C-alpha cells in the first residue's frame, strides 16, 4: 500500500513541494505544542494533591542532561510562581498557559491543513487534465476496445474516488506519523521500559489492520470496474433511446440496467462493510492496548520498583492515548488509500496507454501538396484479420477518387489510414513522395479536411462549430464559408444567427442542416485534401439538393477521397475503386466499369454503395 501511495506522490506532488514543507513545519509545531500542553497537567496534579514536596534551584544548560535541566527549571519556575503569588494564582497561570498553548496548537494544525488543501485540489485538477490530454492524444484505435461509458467513469468516478480517498487522507498521512513519532519520543523519555512493552503490542494490531486493507483494494477495483459498466449502459441507452422506443424494448433495457445496478450494489455493499470495519476494529484494538498498558504500568507502580511516578504515568497514558486517535485515523486513511489506489490502477490504464501513432523525431516539413497521394502495397489489420490487403493506389493532385464496395470491404479504413488515425502495418502511404510517417501529425492533418457520414458537431454556437480548429477566422470568412455550403439562409433564420447554440451534437438542427454546417467547417479550413464519407441517411428532396450542391462546391479543385453512397458523386469521380475483402478488385471511370460488366455494375444495379 505505502509503495503505491508514495509512487503516486512522486508523480503528482513535486510542483507543490513548498506546500508540503509548510505542512510539515506546522504539523511539527502542532505536535510539539500538544506535548507541551499535556506536560502542564503534571504540575497541576502535583499542586492539587500535594504530591511533590521537593525544593528546586535553577540549573544552567550543560550542568546536567538536557531532559533533567528542562524538567528541573520548569518546576523551579512553578515553585517561584507559587512562592510569589500563592498556589491558586499559580494554578490559574498554568491553566491559562494550557489554553494559550492549545490555541497555538489548533492554529498550527489549521495552517497545516490549509496548505494541504492547496495540494489536494491542485493534484486532482492535474490528474483530470492529464487524463483529458491523454484521451485527446491517444489514437482512435485505443477507443475501439474501450467502452465510452467506462472511459467517462475513469474521468469522473475514479478521479473523484482518488480525491475522496487518497487526497483527503493526504493530510492524515503527513500529520499522523509526525504526531505518533513525537509522542513515541516523549514516551521513551518518560519511561523507556514501558515503551518497549508498548512496541511489542503495536505490530500485532498493525498486522491485523493491514490484512483487511489488502482485501479492500481488490473489492474497490471490482466496484470501479462495475461502475464503468453501469455508465456504459446508461450512455448506450440515452444514445439509442429512439431505437429502444421504436422496438418496444423498454422492459429489456430496464432489466439489463437493473441487473448491472444490483451487481454494483452487491460489490459496493461488500466494500463499504469492509471499510466500516476499520473504525470499530481500530477502536477495539486501541482500547485493548490501553488496557494492557494500564495493567502493566500500574503493576510497576504498585510494586514500588518503577522508575516512573504516578503523575508521570498519568502523563504517559495521556500521551499514549494521544497516539491512539492518530493511529486510528492512520488506519482509516490506509483503508481509504487502498480504495483510491484501485481507482489509480484504472486511471493508469489510460495515462500509461501506449500512443502507437507517434511523431517522427525529425519531421519533414509538408505545408502543401503539389503532386498527389500514393498508396504502395498497403496492408492493415484489426487483430488477426487483414482488412486492407496489398492495396496500390495513386491519386493525382486535384483528382477525385470514389471508394465503393459493400459494408466491411475496407473503404473507411483505407481513408482513415491517410490522416494516420491508424498506421499501416506493411507498405506505405506518401504525399508528394514523402512517407506520411515522416511528417508531423499536425502538419499532415492540417492538409486535410474531414466531412463524416454523421455530422459531428459540438454543444456550442453555430459560429464556433464552423470555426472549430480555425480560431483566427474573420466574420467575413465564416459568412463566406456558410454561403458556399448553402448554410447561410437557415443560419440567419435561427433566433440568434451565427450565435445560436445548436444543442448537444446539434440536436436543435435537422439532419440536413447538421451536414451543411459540417461542410461549412471544412470549407473554412480550405484544405488541399478532402476526406468525405457521404451520408447515407435519407433527407428530404430539398435538403438532399442543398447538401449535394454544397459537397460539389467543397470538392471543386481539391484532391478528394470519397466513400461514395450517391451514384451522382460516383459518376463524376475521376477514378472509381471497387473494394472487396480489403482488396481493390476493379478500378476505372464509371463508363469503363459499367462496360466491364463486373462487380461495379452489380453494385450499381443493386444501388448498394
Please report, for each region that a protein language model flagged, where it lies by residue.
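Membrane-integrated ABC transporters
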Residues: 1-39, 48-98, 104, 111-116, ...
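Juxtamembrane helix-loop junctions of ABC transporter transmembrane domains
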Residues: 2, 33-42, 50, 92-93, ...
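An intracellular "coupling" helix at the cytosolic face of ABC transporter transmembrane type-1 domains
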Residues: 12-18, 140-141, 157-166, 170, ...
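Alpha-helical transmembrane segments of multipass membrane proteins
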Residues: 30, 34, 101, 105-109, ...
